[in-house]
Amino acid sequence: MNRTANDFLNAQSAIRDAREDDAEFLAQVILSAAHLSDMDVSEDLTAICRRTDTLYSWRNARIACACGKRAGAMVSYPGDIYLAARSITFPLLPGLTQAQIDATDIETLPGEWYLDSLAVLPEFRRAGIGKMLIMDAIERGRNAGYTQCTLLAEKSSTHLVEYYTRLGFAIESSKLYLGNAYWRMVRR
């Protein structure tokens, strides 16, 4: 996408709170963030996003719209809710075994704002929408009184780690999430 097209797209972009009727789109985002975008969105995952007590609830999401369409989304929330919401969410995830759940590290802690899942649809990538969603999530955390934001970045995605570093995040520790190695990154 050229500079003029990027400028136009940014001028036509807005971020809004997700609504319950965004649940299927959020399920797509979560699959995309997990590099599973070739999977069909299941009714189970959509139902998880439609609930109000799960990690992936529409209440924890913001939607980026560009040119009148949903272009991407960010799921973020206070670490304070993580353990309770995880205990509800993970058993509902299709195909996830108890052994996988037990082997997954804690992603976030109380007292921090967690950026859980981010994805931008392919036709809207490289236009700054992902950065807008990240900065929006950081601002939401700050407005809620959190001074630290965290996220996980897959170790094998060096370009993502570099991107998050440019946005002010620093590697803090290593985490295992559903069998994959991640960096826990922090922005203070």
Model-derived segments and spans:
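Conserved GNAT-fold acetyl-CoA-binding loop/helix
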Residues: 31-50, 84, 90, 94-97
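A short beta-loop-alpha structural element at the N-terminal edge
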Residues: 14-28, 39-40, 78-79
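Active-site rim helix/loop that mediates acceptor-substrate recognition in acyltransferases
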Residues: 40-61, 65-71, 75
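Conserved GNAT acetyl-CoA-binding A-motif
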Residues: 111-113, 125, 134, 141-153
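Conserved beta-strand-loop-alpha-helix junction that forms the acyl-donor binding cleft
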Residues: 116-125, 151-160, 176-182, 187-188
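Conserved N-terminal entry element of GNAT/NAT acetyltransferase domains
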Residues: 1-21, 32, 188
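Conserved active-site alpha-helix within GNAT-family acetyltransferase domains
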Residues: 127, 131-135, 143, 156-173, ...
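Conserved acyl-donor/pantetheine-binding loop and adjacent beta-alpha core of acyl/acetyltransferases
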Residues: 78-113, 117
